A protein has these predicted regions:
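Short amphipathic alpha-helix used as the core "switch/output" element in two-component signaling
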Residues: 65-76
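Two-component/phosphorelay signaling modules centered on CheY-like receiver
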Residues: 14-32, 98
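Acidic catalytic/metal-coordinating carboxylates
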Residues: 35-36, 63-66
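Acidic, metal-coordinating helix/loop segments flanking the phosphotransfer/catalytic sites
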Residues: 33-52
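Alpha4 helix (beta4-alpha4-beta5 surface) of REC/receiver domains from two-component response regulators
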Residues: 66, 87-102
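C-terminal output helix
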Residues: 90, 108-118, 125
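The feature encodes the CheY-like receiver
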Residues: 57-60, 88
Length: 127
């Protein structure tokens, strides 16, 4: 597996983190899991050799959008997919306006998620 196939998942719900991690492992990806934006930012190696981030918008503490804004200031930010149970259209459009690959509503359609990840990683994009 290429190192760019490591995916970071940031979600405050343990079941979501583990479910996504299991799904991605079964498709050949490695994962790093964080329960908050603060936890990710406090780990100096969190984004080392990462191909993609999946970030929940509604994190406790720092929101997913706040985390993305901080990460965007760093060089070499990998592609980001936002996820949320929020049904507001404005949330979707804000995620896209910030520069995310896309926004997926929970519960997440796993086929859509895997297709997006495969497409993005095959393009080797770094934002």
């Amino acid at each position: 597996m290429a190192l760019s196939e490591r995916i970071v998942i940031v979600d405050d719900e343990r079941a979501v983190r583990s479910g996504l991690s299991n799904l991605l492992h079964s498709d050949g990806y490695s994962t790093r899991l964080f329960e908050s934006g603060e936890a990710l930012l406090s780990d100096d190696d969190a984004l080392s050799e990462v191909g993609m981030l999946i970030i929940d918008v509604g994190l406790k503490g720092m929101s997913g959008f706040e985390l993305f804004t901080i990460l965007k200031q760093r060089a070499g930010l990998p592609p980001v997919i936002f996820i949320s149970a929020d049904l507001e259209e404005t949330t979707l459009w804000y995620a896209i306006a910030l520069g995310a690959v896309t926004f997926l509503r929970k519960p997440i359609d796993v086929d859509t998620l895997l297709t997006l990840i495969r497409c993005e990683l095959s393009q080797g994009k770094v934002r």
